[in-house]
């Protein structure tokens, strides 16, 4: 009888050990990112699957800045802002699938210039028909046609950008973060202004400009935040 009791105790210990040590069958397995190939259960996927549908852009929380430069003058940069007017972002199970951002071109503003002067003069010039002709074309718009998730919060956004009534494709990387019932989309695009008939100071179309040649490409950085 004593031997049987010892045997029974050993059986119980073995059974308990089996259930404690074995890995649950429903625990998701992924390969770690450090290149060792070790299996790591329950790795986060950075997706909020409850975030779904079309979300409106909050213009008061969204921002956009631009950077221009002169081609032949080292470190000559002009900086400024333009307001985000409206837009939306479309999500399916926490994944960005589409949307659009509308910019208020009448709000375009130069905050600093390469010569540290004449910001108001540059602002007026940008609004004139020599540049963006905001009286005739008060809005610019980017419409997402493809949102390819590249891992984590990083996407490659492709879409149609309309400036001065002309539309052309553009692609750029963006970070999309969903948290606390809202989303932010932050991207940086390099844009060739001459495609949109903004030719002033471009050596593609004008000669004898000297060091007043303005780079055809400018940088637009924006952050669109949903309501």
Could you say what each language-model-derived stretch is?
Residues 2-227:
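Low-complexity, acidic/polar, glycine-enriched regions of mature
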